[in-house]
C-alpha cells in the first residue's frame, strides 16, 4: 500500500460500527482534550511486547490474553481488577510450567469499553432505540436518554483506564505476582476442584521445583516476585484511538498509546476500511480477528497491508471460528500463510464462535464447546506442522454464572444466579483455571 499514512488518514475512508453523535462540536472538543492528556502507555513498552510476540511467533513462548468482554463504569473497582489479574497469573504459572516456556500475559483491560453490534438498533416490544455500544459510547439502560451517544463518556473511559493501569502496574511489580503466592492460590483451587486428582500431579511437580529453587537460594530473585503485564483492546472507536497517537522520540515511529496492543474485529477488517487504515500506520503489535468468512486470498492481503515488513512480532491472527467450523476452515488458511512465507502469531479465541441462546433466554457459551475449539486449534496446527501460539478468552475473576458447563457445572437454569455481563458471557475463575490446566496438558505434549 503506497498511499501516505497519517493519524487521521482513516477519516477519508468508509467506516463501520461507529456511533452517531448528535453534537459534532462537543465531540471535537472532547477529542482535542483527550489528545492533550498524557498517554496511557509508552512506545518502549509496546516495543517490548512486540519483541515478546516475536518470541511467540517463533515458537519460544506462549500468549495468554484474557479479560472482560466489555469493561463497565458502574462495576469498576480495585477488587474486580485484582481478581481478574490474579486468575490470569494463576493460568500463566500452570502453562509456563507445563510448556517449559515463557507465557506472555496480556489483559483485555484498561480500555476494552466499546463493543461492535450486529445491529445499530435494539427493539423491545414496540420501542426501537440505538443499540448499546459499550459504556464509552452510551448507557445500557433501555431508554432514549441513556442510548444517546455522549462524548463525555470518552473522558470517563480515559480516567478509568488510567486508574486501572496504575493498579495493574502496582500488582505486577509490587509483590502481588510472587510465584509462591500464585502457586498457593492454585493449590486452593485444586483442593476445591472436582478434578483434584487430575491436577495434583502437576501441582506437586511445581511444589518440588519451587522447593528446589528455595534450597538453592533462588527464591528471592526479582523474577519470582514481579511479572510483565500488558494491556490490549479492540481499536473500534477511532476518534478515541487517534487522540492517543504519539510519535516516538527515539525512532520517529507512531504508536497508539491507549494500549500496548490493539486488534481489529471480524466486523471491521475491510481492506478498504478505516480500521485497517488506522492500524497499518501505528507500530504497536496488532491483532486481527479471523472468522469463518475469511478466505485465504483476503487474509494474505490483510497480512501484507498490516505487516508489509513481515516482522514476526507485528501481527497476531486471532482465530474465532466456532467449534463446529474451525476444523474445516483453519487448515486452508494456515497452508496459504505458510506457502506465502508470512510470519504471524496464531492464537485461538474459542469464545465468539460458540455463543448460543439458552432455553431460559440468556446468551451463553458451553464450556465443552470452548474446550472443543481450543483442542481442534491445537490439533490442526500439529497436523500442519505450525505453532499454536496462544489463547484469547473472555473471562473474569468473579464467581459469575454466564457460561454453562465446567467441572462444577453451571446449568441453563443456573445462569440467572449471577449473570452480570454487560455484553457477552464470560468464563468465571473456576472455568478459566480449568481451561488453563487442560491447555497445559496439551502444551506439554506439543512441546516435547
Residue positions per predicted region:
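Short loop/turn segments at strand-loop or loop-helix junctions that form parts
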Residues: 64-69, 106-109, 348-351, 394-396
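Non-transmembrane, aqueous-exposed alpha-helical and coiled segments at domain scale
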Residues: 299-308, 314-345, 352-404
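Short acidic (Asp/Glu) and glycine-rich catalytic loops that position anionic groups and cofactors
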Residues: 62-68, 280-282, 311-313, 352-357
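Active-site-facing alpha/beta catalytic cores
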Residues: 71, 76-322, 365, 390-392, ...
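Short, compositionally biased low-complexity segments
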Residues: 18-21, 53-66, 123-141
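N-terminal basic/disordered segments at the start of proteins
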Residues: 1-62
Amino acid at each position: 500500500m503506497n498511499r501516505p499514512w497519517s493519524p487521521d488518514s482513516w477519516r477519508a475512508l468508509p467506516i463501520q460500527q461507529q456511533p452517531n453523535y448528535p453534537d459534532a462540536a462537543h465531540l471535537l472538543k472532547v477529542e482535542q482534550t483527550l489528545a492533550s492528556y498524557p498517554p496511557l502507555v509508552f512506545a518502549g513498552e509496546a516495543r517490548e511486547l512486540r519483541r515478546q510476540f516475536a518470541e511467540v511467533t517463533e515458537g519460544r513462548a506462549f500468549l495468554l490474553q484474557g479479560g472482560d468482554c466489555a469493561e463497565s463504569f458502574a462495576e469498576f473497582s480495585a477488587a474486580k481488577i485484582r481478581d481478574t489479574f490474579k486468575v490470569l497469573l494463576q493460568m500463566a504459572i500452570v502453562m509456563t510450567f507445563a510448556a517449559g516456556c515463557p507465557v506472555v500475559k496480556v489483559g483485555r483491560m484498561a480500555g476494552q469499553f466499546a463493543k461492535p453490534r450486529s445491529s445499530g438498533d435494539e427493539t423491545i416490544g414496540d420501542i426501537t432505540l440505538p443499540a448499546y455500544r459499550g459504556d464509552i459510547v452510551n448507557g445500557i439502560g433501555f431508554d432514549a436518554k441513556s442510548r444517546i451517544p455522549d462524548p463525555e463518556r470518552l473522558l470517563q473511559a480515559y480516567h478509568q483506564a488510567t486508574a486501572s493501569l496504575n493498579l495493574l502496574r502496582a500488582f505486577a511489580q509490587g509483590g502481588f505476582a510472587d510465584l509462591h503466592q500464585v502457586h498457593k492460590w492454585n493449590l486452593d483451587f485444586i483442593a476445591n476442584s472436582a478434578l483434584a486428582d487430575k491436577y495434583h500431579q502437576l501441582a506437586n511437580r511445581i511444589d518440588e521445583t519451587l522447593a528446589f529453587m528455595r534450597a538453592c537460594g533462588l527464591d528471592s530473585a526479582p523474577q519470582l516476585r514481579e511479572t510483565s503485564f500488558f494491556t490490549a483492546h479492540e481499536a473500534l472507536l477511532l476518534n478515541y484511538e487517534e487522540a492517543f497517537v504519539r510519535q516516538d522520540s527515539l525512532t520517529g515511529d507512531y504508536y497508539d498509546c491507549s494500549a500496548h496492543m490493539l486488534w481489529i474485529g471480524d466486523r471491521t477488517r475491510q481492506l478498504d476500511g478505516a480500521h485497517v487504515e488506522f492500524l497499518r500506520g501505528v507500530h504497536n503489535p496488532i491483532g486481527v480477528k479471523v472468522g469463518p468468512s475469511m478466505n485465504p486470498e483476503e487474509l494474505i492481503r490483510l497480512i501484507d497491508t498490516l505487516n508489509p515488513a513481515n516482522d514476526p512480532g507485528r501481527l497476531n491472527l486471532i482465530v474465532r471460528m466456532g467449534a463446529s467450523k474451525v476444523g474445516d476452515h483453519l487448515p486452508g488458511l494456515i497452508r496459504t500463510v505458510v506457502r506465502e512465507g508470512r510470519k504471524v502469531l496464531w492464537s485461538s479465541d474459542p469464545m465468539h464462535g460458540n455463543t448460543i441462546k439458552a432455553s431460559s433466554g440468556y446468551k451463553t457459551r458451553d464450556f465443552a464447546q470452548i474446550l472443543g475449539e481450543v483442542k481442534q486449534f491445537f490439533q490442526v496446527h500439529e497436523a500442519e506442522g505450525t505453532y499454536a501460539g496462544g489463547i484469547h478468552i473472555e473471562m473474569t475473576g468473579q464467581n459469575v454464572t454466564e457460561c454453562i458447563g465446567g467441572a462444577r457445572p453451571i446449568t441453563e437454569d443456573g445462569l440467572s444466579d449471577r449473570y452480570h455481563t454487560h455484553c457477552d458471557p464470560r468464563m468465571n475463575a473456576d472455568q478459566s483455571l480449568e481451561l488453563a490446566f487442560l491447555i497445559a496438558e496439551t502444551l506439554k505434549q506439543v512441546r516435547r
